[in-house]
UniProtKB/Swiss-Prot annotation:
SMART domains: Aamy
Organism per entry: Prochlorococcus marinus (strain MIT 9312)
Protein known as: 1,4-alpha-glucan branching enzyme GlgB
Catalytic activity as recorded in UniProt: Transfers a segment of a (1->4)-alpha-D-glucan chain to a primary hydroxy group in a similar glucan chain
Taxonomic superkingdom: Bacteria
GO CC entries: cytosol
UniProt function note: Catalyzes the formation of the alpha-1,6-glucosidic linkages in glycogen by scission of a 1,4-alpha-linked oligosaccharide from growing alpha-1,4-glucan chains and the subsequent attachment of the oligosaccharide to the alpha-1,6 position.
Keywords attached to this entry: Carbohydrate metabolism, Glycogen biosynthesis, Glycogen metabolism, Glycosyltransferase, Transferase
Length: 754
């Protein structure tokens, strides 16, 4: 009777294995001590014959209770490693037994930290890891999917057949399997069978490398195999706060900065050409650059321009080029479009060698519905909310993370730490923060659910952002955490222990909209809109602001920066120069999008590269020269950055000359007798003797003039500077009598003598 029960149980388990419905394969497979003897059971779909090979003995395994379940009876304890010899259709191969490795990979402490949302290095456990177990090299797979009925590893190793390698379910919804037959470079997915019997093929949420789109499998990849030489950079970065330093950021999209001819293939280190990544929407005969080519071309360009940082639009793996990277499916993998993870590491390493920081756009606010991604991951709403009123951005067609779930927060917070630790990035810009903070964001009445207090705030998202920033600065005190937050949510850049969100910079969206609205107006009408150009100072010290002219302002029919400007070409160039110069002298850190630095004419298009041929024309060279010189001046004059967030650093001289559309102000360093006087003339009218009050007498050297001939201007100016005269104006006893060029900004520095 006992043997009958045992046989029925074995047959039932075998049927479950065949139907991919077994969550505990170790219960039946691998070595077992049964009725005073050792047996090894092996599950080998479509095998004709199976043998168990030890160092000195071979045992034939017999099919029992099911044609694919084989059992070998051993005379002794199988303590040593063994191999399985499998014959299928006349072909024989040998492999190690995945189910002979029974030790748990995810320990009790790891599970506990993950379950409470505090495992900051969870990527070292989750995903696919090249390890050695019982002196055998292989890959340990580990995934969180608590609602799955069963999960299998599928890939080239088993012809993508989920019946071959079922995973073992552990405590906490963790699934594991050691695959001794797999190695670096192997492609895989998780085949997940839901409680309802549906089957999903999912890429690894923690995968370190993924296939090039349109394929979407994950690829086994080594993690810690790169030799960094930026220790001095990292030490210096984390030794003090970065926000009290000059920050000038070049925002860019790697795939549309510069393209290469398909005739010029990238040559690998081994001398072989790399096949171009397919991109049907690019111009015929062109291809994307690789990470090594970007290292060679982009970094010197950014260094020559004088920017302190590069901001990369999302490079985490994403299936659709047209999303610009903002619909992420591979959170722990740099996109394969441009090369390998180590090639991206070398890009960052080289940036640091050249004194350039690297900021990544990070998108924890939503994720796409692609079938291979996080959506409905284990047959349930695991990463997202089940109710679309709080779990979906219908306008974007994406899903919202369930921030109330500890493991989901852990996935995201650890991802933040991962990019800093494994790729040495220096900062993040969090996209669309407002969409996270408000439950009714882009939602009509009746299509959102109030929070527990009846309000529209997303309390769980607030707590997540606070946790993410707290953990980030705990690990990397010199990091930059920049919020793209478009509302008046308070205390975005205040510390979390004060109730703030914990960012250290926030894009000043109000300044950006006011400036663009103002500069699009015909200069004659600007006299009626003076408030647009001055209002930002009234709230400037409520947050740590960064002034940004971003990619969002040069797409979807908005025109690129140059073509937003009114008038003929000369006025467009002059207005552009004036806006950029005013931006560099206004309190706040700086960010501009690629192409603005030389006057790109066409709107940004993700499929096209920049109009580099424009640099053959002097006006465009002039704008680039202006940006170069502004960055150099900015870094050399502490008054332009040292007190960005302190009212002491800025003082109006006159902001009320509406009829002339002229403003003047001072930028000051700490307790020094040197300061800068900035005078802006936002009309095409020239003023030959415009008086501006100054605090003390002395010589004021003209250190910058956006109308200079080097920049394509008319070269009107003040012959190198002006001596202050005794004249009472703007509440000062001294004044400068200046020539103000048309559509220009001039900068003067006080000196004790000429």
């Amino acid at each position: 009777m006992i043997e009958t029960i045992q046989a029925d149980w074995i047959q039932s388990e075998a049927i479950n294995l065949e139907n991919c419905c077994n969550d505990n394969p170790l219960k039946i497979l691998g070595p077992h001590f049964y009725e005073e003897q050792w047996v090894i059971r092996v599950w080998m779909p479509e095998a004709d014959e199976v043998k168990i090979n030890f160092k000195n003995n071979t045992y034939k395994a017999e099919s029992i209770n099911h044609k694919w379940l084989f059992e070998a009876i051993l005379p002794e304890n199988p303590e040593s490693n063994y191999e399985i010899n499998i014959s299928r259709g006349g072909i024989t191969h040998t492999q190690h037994d995945p189910w002979s490795y029974i030790e748990e990979w995810m320990g009790e402490v790891d599970r506990h930290l993950f379950a409470e949302g505090n495992h900051h290095h969870i990527w070292e456990k989750m995903g696919a890891h090249l390890i050695e177990e019982k002196n055998q090299k292989g890959v340990m797979f580990c995934i969180w999917a608590p609602n799955a009925k069963s999960i299998s590893i599928i890939g080239d190793i088993n012809s993508w057949d989920g019946r071959h390698h079922p995973m073992q379910k552990r405590l906490g919804g963790i699934w594991e399997l050691f695959m001794p037959t797999m190695e670096e470079g192997d492609t895989y997915k998780y085949e997940i069978r839901t409680q309802q019997g549906h089957i999903y093929e999912k890429a690894d949420p923690y995968g370190f490398l993924h296939e090039i789109r349109p394929q979407n499998g994950s690829i086994v990849s080594k993690l810690k195999n790169f030799n960094w030489n930026d220790n001095a950079w990292i030490t210096n970065r984390d030794s003090s706060s970065q926000i009290n330093k000059p920050i000038s950021v070049y925002e860019m999209h790697l795939g549309s900065w510069l393209h290469e001819s398909t005739d010029n293939k990238y040559i690998e280190d081994n001398g072989n050409p790399r096949n171009p990544v397919p991109a049907a929407d690019l111009k015929p005969g062109t291809r994307l650059l690789t990470y090594p080519e970007l290292t060679e071309k982009l970094i010197p360009y950014v260094k020559d321009r004088g920017f302190t940082h590069i901001e990369l639009m999302p490079i985490s793996e994403h299936p659709f080029d047209g999303s610009w990277g903002y619909q992420v499916t591979g959170w722990y993998a740099p996109t394969s479009r441009f090369g390998t993870p180590n090639e991206f590491r070398e890009f960052v390493n080289k940036c640091h060698e050249e004194g350039i920081g690297v900021i990544l756009d990070w998108v924890p606010g939503h994720f796409p519905k692609d079938k291979h991604g996080l959506a409905f991951f284990d047959g349930c709403h695991l990463y997202e909310h089940g109710d679309s009123r709080i779990g979906e951005h219908k306008e974007w067609g994406t899903l919202i993370f369930n921030y109330s779930r500890n493991e989901v927060r852990n996935f995201l917070v650890a991802n933040l730490v991962y990019w800093f630790e494994e790729f040495h990035i220096d900062g993040i810009r969090v996209d669309a923060v407002a969409s996270m903070l408000y439950r009714d964001y882009l939602r009509p009445d009746g299509e959102w659910i109030p929070n527990e207090n009846g309000g529209n705030e997303n309390i769980e998202a607030v707590k997540f952002l606070q946790q993410a920033n707290h953990v980030l600065f705990q690990h990397f005190p010199g990091a930059l955490s920049i919020a793209e937050e478009s509302t008046t949510w308070p205390m975005v850049t205040k510390p979390t222990d004060m109730g703030g969100l914990g960012f250290n910079l926030k894009w000043n969206m109000g300044w950006m909209h006011d400036m663009l609205d103002y500069f699009e107006i015909d200069p004659w009408f600007r006299q009626f809109h003076q408030n647009s150009v001055t209002f930002s100072i009234t709230y400037n010290y409520t947050e740590n602001f960064m002034l940004a002219l971003s990619h969002d302002e040069v797409v979807h029919g908005k025109s690129h920066l140059l073509h937003k400007m009114p008038g003929d070409d000369w006025k467009k160039y002059a207005n552009t120069r004036a806006l950029l110069t005013y931006m560099w002298t206004h309190p706040g850190k700086k960010t501009i999008f690629m192409g603005m630095e030389f006057g790109q004419r066409q709107e940004w298009n993700v499929w096209d590269d920049l109009q580099w041929d424009l640099l053959e024309f002097e006006p465009h060279k002039g704008i680039r020269n202006l940006v170069d010189d502004l960055n150099a001046l900015y870094k050399n004059e502490p008054a332009l950055w040292k007190n960005d967030f302190d009212p002491y650093g800025f003082q109006w001289i006159d902001c009320n000359d509406k009829s002339n559309s002229v403003i003047s102000f001072m930028r000051r360093e700490n307790d020094t007798n040197e300061w800068l006087v900035i005078v802006a003339n936002f009309t095409p009218n020239t003023h030959d003797s415009y008086k501006v009050g100054v605090p003390v007498e002395g010589f004021y050297k003209e250190i910058f003039n956006s109308d200079g001939s080097r920049y394509g201007g008319s070269n009107k100016g003040n012959m190198g500077g002006k001596e202050a005269i005794n004249y009472n104006i703007h509440d000062y006893q001294n004044a400068l009598e200046l020539a103000l060029p048309p559509l220009s900004v001039s900068i003067f520095k006080h000196q004790s003598k000429k």
